[in-house]
């Protein structure tokens, strides 16, 4: 037993003294801990009745490190256990946590602690989405290297997370800007390139003509001007890297049907992808009969009718008319604004080898997000009119049989097939030849990942004048970022300035070549990070397949709803791709999603739109006004930000109220998916403060009852007291059932807290005799503390330390020599699950108890049936017959129906 006492520390040593013949009541002696004079039980051996702010601080100071060390000792290596992978979206290391961070990480921490108590093998990892524009801006503005700025911020934010008492799986920490992570981002990019899913084409960028540099959208103000130079931003075509996400559109759209837990988010994903009814096909381009080496990709919703093509149409804004194409002059000479224009450029279908003209359409906007489409008169009246107007030849390729079946004609090997069969066969053939054929929508675009930035993952491609774009050999990864001494924010891509880094040898021919100087969009880094968490230190591959297959999919993914479209789409894309590469067995990465709401602060705004600080506002009148000018202010609730002067510093509120109080406030103030209006004067904060006080008071009453010198003897309870204890037993089981459901199904942690508050209220009303002699009271009190532990780990740890030292306990199924967070989650007693055939339904009339009647179990939850059952009973006939009943209210949980009667 000695190792047990050593592991559990001071309060266990007190218990040992009692078990070894000490007195049968708690000794209220004060132990002096070197360097501290605390007033809490764990430090002094003396229970204090008062639960003050100082007590809360002392409790959290005492338990903070102990809980952290406790969590670090729990092994994650036992693969025989069922697993639970809870993941909160990792933060950008901006340098300071905000309340939104506190909310999402409090939720994930609470769920992780709960699942550990259920006996699950749990990981709750944390890392840093560390590449990105702010670090580069800081380098320009403050003359700091992005690496230094980022690492400093990570160090500070890690300390902040630690001060919040959050127990992450820190041994799994990842940082996307470190070579040991982005090596594998580059590896996955090369796999995409080899699969034909990464390619280059021209695309528009924001161009600053003064600084001669590309700007991110965030660097362009509302007037279309550069953030630094103030110059009017231009749109310019540059050759950019894309990932062909459209190749997985249909698979990802179909897979949504297998995600029943994605409530609210599935619709957003489906809308982003669009209706996958067609595909893109590739064409080579000729002018005046000469091949140009250029390609054009165009969309059709009816690829089965491709042999009936009359033309390929492009919009007036197409890149061929505005970029660096060799066809630009020929196309522009043919352009007549406002008219459909036939051009001398011919498009050769790479699947069918048909040659058709390119037409510039009069209308600027095509369907969806298209800028090119295939004209097929057999399936489009609009295409028929255009072909006839311009005198274009085409074939009718669809025949309708007498029974209404449509079959193909004049369509090579597809002739005679039904349209449905031809659609499948033709798109499959196109995919096999890598000339298109991926079923997608007319609105989804491929993912542009090029960024003309320094602080991002280098794209592992070498440009050779002989071999063309060539991937860096896998054994030569990572391609690390060169050390650039200064950043000006001007000129071309920063990496282009590092000439020693740019100039290299071609991996194939060994001739002179140049590295790609664009870096990847940071969304690429975060599109696969959930895989790396499963095997974060693997030096040989992004992750081990067997390890990833054990932990994946993520059981619960928590993050802001603002990421419910793009980030989730890209993450799903990477997961589908890795599945097809035989890297993982699961296609979808996330089982359940919890998109938490915002934390909003109150704002005060002048009619001019200027936001005021709270100190500038006069709140003494009926409406807020500007303290100086007395102008009326617009008062709103908005997402917290510095510019709106409505932010709250997490460290300040934790210092003021304590960690557990802020945790409980965040979890109790609103359901996780709803916004929280941050106002500590509302009922939520006083409510959770009162609840902590009630938990403390309940424990005090129990300790005092058992320390009174009287032995607990259940047989001394009267029938009335036994009935009271039975009610507590029923209430406890009901709460266990409902709280467990909230933790596992709907994650309504606010409702879980409400249930626990109800149980604590019921326990508060227990008679002194029940407290002393009833095992039901003891069990319900202990179950309450265990269920509250994931929500408020510090105060419940202290309370459990007090409960553990109570002599002559009646409940043997708790592990009294372990802390509350190491207890097994309470289970509903089997007897409670055996529902009785008859429920004793309490009948109230105008809120006054009038008796009980037996009601069959099968109707006890049906409002109308219980209502009628009561009316036909002897009690109902006697008390309700002939009276005007306005309404009745049924409470199935408490077996009570209340009739409101007109007197």
From Swiss-Prot:
Q: Give any single GO term for biological process.
A: mitochondrial translation
Protein keywords: Acetylation, Aminoacyl-tRNA synthetase, ATP-binding, Deafness, Disease variant, Ligase, Mitochondrion, Nucleotide-binding, Phosphoprotein, Protein biosynthesis, Transit peptide
Tissue expr: Ubiquitously expressed, but highest expression in tissues with high metabolic rates, such as skeletal muscle, heart, and kidney.
The main location class comes to mitochondrion
> What GO cellular-component annotations does this UniProt entry give?
mitochondrial matrix; mitochondrion
Instruction: State the similarity comment.
Output: Belongs to the class-I aminoacyl-tRNA synthetase family.
Binding residue positions for ATP: 642
Protein's recorded name: Leucine--tRNA ligase, mitochondrial
NCBIfam families registered for this protein in UniProt: leuS_bact (TIGR00396)
- Gene3D superfamilies annotated for this entry? HUPs, Isoleucyl-tRNA Synthetase, Domain 1
* EC main group: ligase
Give this protein's Gene Ontology molecular function annotations.
aminoacyl-tRNA deacylase activity; ATP binding; leucine-tRNA ligase activity
Give the residue ranges of motif 'HIGH' region. 92-102
The record's EC number reads: 6.1.1.4
Instruction: According to the UniProt record, list the residues that bear N6-acetyllysine.
Output: 68, 236
Phosphoserine modified-residue sites: 711
Chemical reaction(s) catalysed: tRNA(Leu) + L-leucine + ATP = L-leucyl-tRNA(Leu) + AMP + diphosphate
Question: What's the disease link here?
Answer: Perrault syndrome 4: An autosomal recessive, sex-influenced disorder characterized by sensorineural deafness in both males and females, and ovarian dysgenesis in females. Affected females have primary amenorrhea, streak gonads, and infertility, whereas affected males show normal pubertal development and are fertile.
- In terms of superkingdom, the source organism counts as Eukaryota
**Location of this chain's protein in the cell:** Mitochondrion matrix
Q: What Pfam families is this protein classified in?
A: Anticodon_1, tRNA-synt_1, tRNA-synt_1_2
Instruction: Give the residue ranges of motif 'KMSKS' region.
Output: 639-643
Q: Which InterPro entries match?
A: aa-tRNA-synth_I_CS, aa-tRNA-synth_Ia, Leu-tRNA-ligase, Leu_tRNA-synth_edit, M/V/L/I-tRNA-synth_anticd-bd, Rossmann-like_a/b/a_fold, tRNAsynth_Ia_anticodon-bd, Val/Leu/Ile-tRNA-synth_edit
Function according to Swiss-Prot or TrEMBL: Catalyzes the attachment of leucine to its cognate tRNA.
